[in-house]
Amino acid sequence: SHFPVTPELPYDYNMDALDSSWQGYFRTFLANRDYDLDISAQTLMKNLRKAYKLPAEWTQEQIYKVISIRYELELRSVPDVGMENYTLATVVSAEDLAAVMELGVPGVIVESGTVREYNTAYAAHLLGELGKLGPDEVDEYLAKGYAMNALVGKSGIEQAFEEYLHGTSGTKYTTVSRSGEVLDQYYTTLPQPGNNVELTIDISLQAVAEDALEKVILDLRENGVGRKKEGKDAEGGAVVVQQCKTGEILACASYPTYNLSTYRNTVAGYNELLEDPYRPFFNRAILAPYPPGSIYKMVTAIAIVDDGGIDPGFIIEDEGLYTRFKSFQPKCHIWSKATGATHGKINLMEAIAYSCNYYFFEAGWQTYNKFRAEAVNPFDTVAKALGLGEPTGVELPEERGTRANAEEKAAQFEGDEAGWYDADVLQAVIG
């Protein structure tokens, strides 16, 4: 039988082990009987039920479970299919283990294996988990020398760094008597451990980010924000904290989330997470493209100064309603017909501080119009240079997102809706 190696552990920024491996008991059934595979599914089920002498009063569910296991055992004993052990149970209690051993069932042996244990309730989306080979993974991993019973990374860091974390499986032979007594065990190939992976994540900061994010989202759902109590429909959110000088990701939180240590404890609990409309398994931090909102004004500000030639001290008077175009007249966020409130005369630095839409409408339009004849979008040029709408280089699967430009719009819409208009420019400059 193939004896899987213990995958090494991902560490956080402070070199604290984020998960560990501990020994659990496995009951394994070794079968070795010839079986005719040239048989229809219906006939197979009928014959197996008779051959296994399953009680007539059993439910269809009970019958299916037992036949599935017994058939798997038979299949594994077929020549050229493989002699991989079949694991009947994992993490068996001492009481159950003793009961099984007392029965002395031939072919049933006990082996110690490794079980991944997570030492933190945080960073579930980042760490990911291990799992058995899926049908679509078997050929790929067998070609790499993996055993059929190998555990591989299924998501997160576990999956992204599988080739580094996973060592080399060993091969162990076990000889048992007819009574089930283990007569001999020996390795022909010793398992070799994999490597550790050091993350830039600071698990303490990650915990602060996740807790704060949860608090904010739940408060939004209950109370909303502002006079209009907006935000009560908040589904989730994300927080990313980077080291400014290096770009290292120190925390990457997504809400809602789940606990890797407990979420599979019960079928009901797991199904509840699967059916949760807020999708706790979805990593919003790197897989969900969102409109940036007013933070995009920083992109516009760079283009205004570097490409538009507008001095940061240039004054524009906020008139509330931007009336340059008859067909589209957006407004500053503090303006309304009832109050007529504006930011008055304002420069670039003040416009950033107060997030004045009007300033960016006017300064942005002047800058865009300067390059109109050249068919150049200065804001898109700056956005691309800053990495927006481009792969970030993070090792986990990510959604690159898009940028607000004529090409992206033409790819997403048809007919008149695919055109790039003055209104699109005004919308783009404020995010």
Locate predicted features.
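Beta-lactam-recognizing serine transpeptidase/beta-lactamase-like catalytic domain environment
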Residues: 174-192, 201, 231-232, 237-295, ...
